[in-house]
Amino acid sequence: MGLLLLVLILTPLLAAYRHPDFPLLEKAQQLLQSTGSPYSTNCWLCTSSSTETPGTAYPASPREWTSIEAELHISYQWDPNLKGLMRPANSLLSTVKQDFPDIRQKPPIFGPIFTNINLMGIAPICVTAKRKNGTNVGTLPSTVCNVTFTVDPNQQTYQTYTHNQFRHQPRFPKPPNITFPQGTLLDKSTRFCQGRPSSCSTRNFWFRPADYNQCLQISNLSSTAEWVLLDQTRNSLFWENKTKGANQSQTPCVQVLAGMTIATSYLGISAVSEFFGNSLTPLFHFHISTCLKTQGAFYICGQSIHQCLPSNWTGTCTIGYVTPDIFIAPGNLSLPIPIYGKSQLPRVRRAIHFIPLLAGLGILAGTGTGIAGITKASLTYSQLSKEIANNIDTMAKTLTTVQEQIDSLAAVVLQNRRGLDMLTAAQGGICLALDEKCCFWVNQSGKVQDNIRQLLNQASSLRERATQGWLNWEGTWKWFSWVLPFIGPFVSLLLLLLFGPCLLNLITQFVSSRLQAIKLQTNLSAGRRPRTIQESPF
């Protein structure tokens, strides 16, 4: 009985669900084509979905090399021979972490973001690092680089401290040296490289005061009014406009070139301690990686794109920007946008989940709650169908207004045409005067009106189906969704009250008969004949 009631309740709910009316899409597409809408005739700007060539890389300009900001990530490794220097080494390491806020201690995630990227154009600056045991990130060919800086990563540098200097701020040596092609640098008299960028912390050891004699001009990247300068002390690039004077306010704290050279360095701190007879003892090693902090900029290394370069990297890289591959599709090209009709619509099989009817009112109450959820979803779908129908009506009215404007404009154009024909009647009309082959206008407003009428009919049909059904009466669905969860427990209680006494009576008779049979069997097994009422002595 409960299963039959469940089926009766679920049947109208499942029947209320229907697939969307996909011919509406076909009508809308035909309407756009017949009205000559720009959405159906203009070119489409599309991005490539191919995974082989995900995009194209463009190199950064020399000025962008001076403005793109980089950041450093530091990691350290203890020397296994610390022994008695563990406490002072910990003190020195805590000083390093506190005094250099421009260095991040969390290591970044390495690896190429994209591969098979093509570099368009010539890169003004490339940086090459060669290390036998380094991490290869990719190599650009020399033909795409205007100026190539070669980093000498084989330099191993240590900073020496005595035991009583552990509490002072450490000063690391300058970054590794870089070499340049012959004739690239010109010694120009300028003080532009001196000073410190305003965005840099005063405790940053990478921007120590620069030497005046170490500020050199890169001839291949400079012009008469604009100079690209290299500070060999800090391995940083500066852009100077000779007509506006020197100003380093826009210079980032850590530049790209400085970060790339620092990431190839091998830095360590040693100490002269009395524990080892005042001999030079290594304490710990620093490994520094670099990342681009400016949004949209990447390291371009060969055909790979990186956001960060690991410590001890090797290869040839430049910086630039990446754009996805874009192609222009003409208006008459069929784009891969599937539009289905009723006959082509792939039907989705919907499985109906039946709750097993087990004993207990709790299971039946859960069934009522499930029915309420299905009803709520059906009501939501109906409301969505109404909104879609309203939107279609609005779109049809808008297209009707556009068509009326086009008809009005066509009437004005034809009126002007008649006037021009009268003025050029001696030459056979404006068409012959201009030697035009197509001089006729085909009025297709009737097709547009027919398509709009069909679109409105489809919207009206969709709205009627959404408002039909015993669960969609206007004004009842708002309170019915609250009452429906109590129907399951109420019906279960009603069934229990109707059939409970009968079931209890049957169970009582069954138990009584079984007890009488057991008692009779017990008397027979004891050898006594049961007495009837007539044989009783009483």
Swiss-Prot record:
Motif stretch (CXXC): 43-46
Posttranslational mods: Specific enzymatic cleavages in vivo yield the mature SU and TM proteins.
Motif placement: CX6CC: 431-439
Listed transmembrane segments: 479-499
Positions occupied by motif CKS-17: 414-430
Residue(s) at site: Cleavage: R350, A351
Region (Fusion peptide): 354-374
Extracellular topology ranges: 31-478
Record's keyword terms, sorted: Cell membrane, Cleavage on pair of basic residues, Disulfide bond, ERV, Glycoprotein, Membrane, Signal, Transmembrane, Transmembrane helix, Transposable element
An example Gene Ontology biological process: syncytium formation by plasma membrane fusion
Disulfide feature: C43-C46, C43-C439, C431-C438
Positions bearing carbohydrate: N133, N146, N177, N220, N241, N247, N312, N332, N443
Topology, Cytoplasmic side: 500-538
Endpoints of the signal sequence: 1-15
Protein's job: This endogenous retroviral envelope protein has retained its original fusogenic properties and participates in trophoblast fusion and the formation of a syncytium during placenta morphogenesis. The interaction with MFSD2A is apparently important for this process.
UniProt record similarity statement: Belongs to the gamma type-C retroviral envelope protein family. HERV class-I FRD env subfamily.
Assembly and binders: The surface and transmembrane proteins form a heterodimer. They are attached by non-covalent interactions or by a labile interchain disulfide bond.
Note: In contrast with its primate orthologs, this envelope does not confer infectivity to pseudotyped virions. This is due to a N to T transition at position 532 in the cytoplasmic tail of the TM protein.
Comment on protein domains: The CKS-17 immunosuppressive domain is present in many retroviral envelope proteins. As a synthetic peptide, it inhibits immune function in vitro and in vivo.
Name listed for the protein in its UniProt record: Syncytin-2
Lineage: Eukaryota, Metazoa, Chordata, Craniata, Vertebrata
